[in-house]
Amino acid sequence: MNALRLAVLAALWGALCACGPIKSTAFLLDAEVQIEAARTAGADKLSPYEWTAANLYIHKAREEVGYSDFEAGVEYAGKASKFANEARDKAMAVARGDPGAGVVTPPSP
């Protein structure tokens, strides 16, 4: 009975230890796909702020995962994905010629 309990605890511990690397890898892959979609839409030229932010965040995410700080890696990868989506959407709007696309309006006081 003790051996079974120990085996179950060891399996559970192993599964919990693997959650960080698996989750961070999934978030990194998603962000990389979003960045590639933004590149395809021409975001590097049509939406440079969001494009640059996405690339800097994915770089930082990879760095944090390299240091085994998976929580920070997931956070930065999520930000990279968010900025890549914004870059793609903005680039597509500019390419379509939507009025106001790419125009930044200051926040109201």
Please place each PLM-identified region on the residue numbering:
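Sec-dependent bacterial lipoprotein signal peptides
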Residues: 1-19
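Long, charged/polar, soluble alpha-helical segments
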Residues: 19-109
